[in-house]
Amino acid sequence: GAITVAAPAVAGTNTLTLPASTGTVLTDTAPKAGNVLQVVHYLWQSNVSTTSTSYVDSGITATITPSSTSSKILVIGSANAVFTAAVNTGVRIGLFNGATELTTPAFYAGYDTASTDNQRNVPFSNLHSPSSTSAQTYIIKFYRNTGSGSVAIGANDSNSFITLMEIAG
């Protein structure tokens, strides 16, 4: 069988035919383990610079509310790290869920030359099991872990992003 939805009277044929089936992704109330249930994406196009040797907030953040306590959150993204003209300057980038650092070890990038505004995209990922249906906020923080120059996340019209995917457990 099928369900037919007829469009209003206009020029041409405008009929949409849908199969009469159950259990599709659109109507299933018990998704299979591994199904993607929702996606949150945040594109960050700004700049935060520091010489700090302890974590500072980059501005790259996104929040997702899991629909089940058995869900996992797949976090992927990339932070564009920019280094000033200082030899051996490095950056440590950490992924946090609230105040808890999820990435151990953290992600690192660095330069050993004194060029101006060296840049490096630093990809990151984590599969987190929050075991909660409360809103989960993921934040990228960073600091200068080596050298004497400043480090920045974003600059020179570069983009950074974070994407959160709820995966059914």
Protein language model features and the residues they cover:
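Short Gly/Ser/Thr-biased coil->beta-strand turn/linker motifs
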Residues: 1-3, 13-17, 23-24, 38-40, ...
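Self-processing/autoproteolytic domain segments and adjacent N-terminal interaction modules in large
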Residues: 5-7
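Surface-exposed, glycine- and small/polar-enriched segments that build interaction surfaces at terminal
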Residues: 9-11
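Glycine-rich, low-complexity segments
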Residues: 16-47, 169
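Terminal beta-strand-rich extracellular "head" domains
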Residues: 43, 49, 54, 65-169
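A short beta-strand-loop element at or near the start of a globular domain
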Residues: 55-61
